[in-house]
Each structure stands twice: as structure tokens, then as C-alpha cells.
Amino acid sequence: MIEDNKENKDHSLERGRATLIFSLKNEVGGLIKALKIFQEKHVNLLHIESRKSKRRNSEFEIFVDCDTNREQLNDIFHLLKSHTNVLSVTPPDNFTMKEEGMESVPWFPKKISDLDHCANRVLMYGSELDADHPGFKDNVYRKRRKYFADLAMSYKYGDPIPKVEFTEEEIKTWGTVFRELNKLYPTHACREYLKNLPLLSKYCGYREDNIPQLEDISNFLKERTGFSIRPVAGYLSPRDFLSGLAFRVFHCTQYVRHSSDPFYTPEPDTCHELLGHVPLLAEPSFAQFSQEIGLASLGASEEAVQKLATCYFFTVEFGLCKQDGQLRVFGAGLLSSISELKHVLSGHAKVKPFDPKITYKQECLITTFQDVYFVSESFEDAKEKMREFTKTIKRPFGVKYNPYTRSIQILKDAKSITNAMNELRHDLDVVSDALGKVSRQLSV
């Protein structure tokens, strides 16, 4: 009993980075009172930002990033509730789950609406830009970035994605990138990409003089592969980003790179997302490959998540495949970068066969060309290799996605596994019956 109490106490003192969003009336002293709660609980504030509430004109929303333990976070939540409207509390990744037999498992979303708890844990927010960013000294650009960040931070599951009126400068930047990349796609992009790009032009307004709206793209993808788009303010951690893929949700930025250098961006922007990722998210086999990496990440250790993220990086972002005896590109980072797209098929780039056991050890480079690129025989080949690799990830349970409820089934005991098998048995019966009918028709 003494050991159990000690274990519970240690559990409550686990530390991590948490985020809270709460609203305050626009009155003198309101913020000071709220921040005093953090001070009294000895919680270190890492970042704080305010924005005008979109719910009530008389209120402001406060975004707080802090270093805390479970006990402190619980106390702060209850104290804040007494005189603020707490809109969102996102616990750290390392705060473990409370379900029986899963005490050592990091928290992960169980239903699609749970993504509301992790989609705002961006590593950089709004107008925060590094000193070497092309838009660092451009106050107009920084203000615009904050506008896009606020849209994303206000988004909740089930909301329509707000339509954006892009500026003339943003459309011109997009148009420059769109025009130059489309010159390369016929000789560089894989056939699946080339098949889907015209459909996006037809149904989503992909044009040189128009930046497509995320809501239109999301609706298109839902019909094609069941994927949907969720706006995000910036970089997410690998765990948070991959968890979205498990639900066939792609976290997508909406801001445009700085106009001073349309062929370079140090971070994912709408040109990268819409031209690099979206055409292949409309491809069923590729969509399944992406989702399976996401499912493998749920509840996995930090080490395992990092391995999965590296494999994702060298496939979905910078992957190559073989088609008709030639190398073709399917990685979004390549398909949205004119210079690197030319480089990777120039004959000067180092290329190796994709093998997750080797690939996960490779360093990911962000601001330069990759030292090596990995080639798969096909999406199916990459998928099979990743399936074998994910079997090596230690997890005290299995997971299965339920597309009807858009939730995760945790397979951890005889009952849950039996239920999953019954569902599969029904699906197999349907396929078997169809095969029988086809066979009888052929024999007539």
C-alpha cells in the first residue's frame, strides 16, 4: 500500500509542457488576477499571448504555454474556472493514460474531436519568426501571419474552415510557384500525382491566379479517400501531427511564404501543403499508407514516434518511387521545391532503397537538400515494409480505426479483439458472397 501511494505521488509530479486558453472580460486587473494563480502554484510560464475574442467583443482570449505537473495543472484549471472562462486545456504528451493496464502509455486522442486538444500545440505561433526568416523584418507580413494563426487556433472539430480573402501579393507569390512547378511535374512527378492534379483544378480551383480554399479541398478529399483538412497555425510536434493522420486528418497551414523569395520557405506554407501533399492524399493507396503511420504512433514511446516521423519524412515528404523503369517523385517536400525537385532527378543526388530499419537512422535536413533520398518500388511496397517495421514497436495493445464513429478502438483484451474479428468476419462474408456471384456468372 505504501508503494502504491508513492507511485501515485510520483505519477502526479510528472512534468511537461501544457497549454491553456481562457477568456477574460476587458477590464483592469483581470489578467493580473489570472496570472497570479500560476505564480502562487509556482508554475513557470514559457509563453503568453492575447487576442480579441471571436465569441464576444467585450472579451480577450489568453493563450498560455507553461511548464507544469499534473497536480499543478489540475489546481490551476479549477482556480481559473472560478473567474475566467477556460476554453481549452492541453496536457503534455508525457502525462500518461489512466485506463487500467495502460498507466505507462502517453495520452493520445481516442475520437476525432480529441484533436482539438492537441492541434493548437504549435511550436511557433503567428508572428513569431526566426531572425533568418525572409519575413522577419516585415511587420505587415507578421501581422498577416498572426491573422492566419488566429483562424487556426479558433477552429474546432465540426466547424467549416473559414474562407480567406488572399491579398494580391499572396496570389502573385502562389502563382509564381504554381507556374514554375507545373513545368516540372510532367517529367518529375509520379503518375498518381499527375492523375489527381487536374481533378483539383476542376473541383477545387487550383489555378495560377487563385489560391484554393481549405474547405473546398477538405470536401473533395472526403469524397476521394476519407481524408479531411484541419487548419493549423504552424509546426506541430511529430506525435501531434501523426495522431491526426490516424483519423485521416491532415493538419494544414494556410499562410503564404514571403514574397521576397517565392522559391524558398523554412517552414510548411500553403504552397507546400496544397501542391505537395494534397494531390496524393486524394490517392487511396497513399492515403492508407499515411494513416497507417499515424495509427502506429498512437500511444508509442517518444523513441518510436521519432522513428516513425523520420520514416514519414523520407517517404511522404522526400520519397521517390520507380515507375516504368524510371525514378519519379511522390514526396511533398520535393514536389513543392523547384530547386530540389530538379536536383533529386539530376543524377547527382544519392539514392538508396527504402528500408525503415535503415531509413529511421538518417538525419532529416530542413534548410538544405537531403544527403540521401530513399526510393520505394511502389506505394504498396512502402506500405508493406512499414507494416513489418511497426510490428517492432512495443505497445501493450493494438489499435483499429472505426470510420463510422471516427474513433480509435483499443485492442487490449479478449473482448475487444473478438469484437474486431466479428467485424472483419462480416466484411469477409460480403466479399466471399460477391466472389461467388461473379464465379457463377462467369461459368454460365
Curated annotation (Swiss-Prot):
Specify whether Endoplasmic reticulum is a keyword of the entry.
Answer: no
Give any Pfam family that matches. Answer: ACT
Q: Which InterPro entries match?
A: ACT-like_dom_sf, ACT_dom, ArAA_hydroxylase, ArAA_hydroxylase_Fe/CU_BS, ArAA_hydroxylase_sf, Aro-AA_hydroxylase_C_sf, Aromatic-AA_hydroxylase_C, Trp_5_mOase
**Which Gene Ontology biological process is one annotated for this entry?**
regulation of hemostasis
Return one GO MF term. tryptophan 5-monooxygenase activity
The alphabetized UniProt keywords are:
Iron, Metal-binding, Monooxygenase, Oxidoreductase, Phosphoprotein, Serotonin biosynthesis, Ubl conjugation
- Where does the chain bind Fe cation? 272, 277, 317
In this chain the ACT domain maps to 19-94
Question: Could you tell me what reaction this enzyme catalyses?
Answer: (6R)-L-erythro-5,6,7,8-tetrahydrobiopterin + L-tryptophan + O2 = 5-hydroxy-L-tryptophan + (4aS,6R)-4a-hydroxy-L-erythro-5,6,7,8-tetrahydrobiopterin
Please name the SUPFAM superfamilies in this protein's record.
ACT-like, Aromatic aminoacid monoxygenases, catalytic and oligomerization domains
One GO term describing the cellular component: neuron projection
Please outline how this chain is modified post-translation: Ubiquitinated, leading to its degradation by the proteasome. Ubiquitinated is triggered by phosphorylation.
Residues binding L-tryptophan, per UniProt:
235, 257, 265, 336, 366
The cofactor named in the record is: Fe(2+)
Assembly and interaction partners: Homotetramer. Interacts with DNAJC12.
Q: What is this protein's function per UniProt? A: Oxidizes L-tryptophan to 5-hydroxy-l-tryptophan in the rate-determining step of serotonin biosynthesis.
> What name is this protein filed under?
Tryptophan 5-hydroxylase 1
In its UniProt entry, the species of origin is given as Oryctolagus cuniculus (Rabbit)
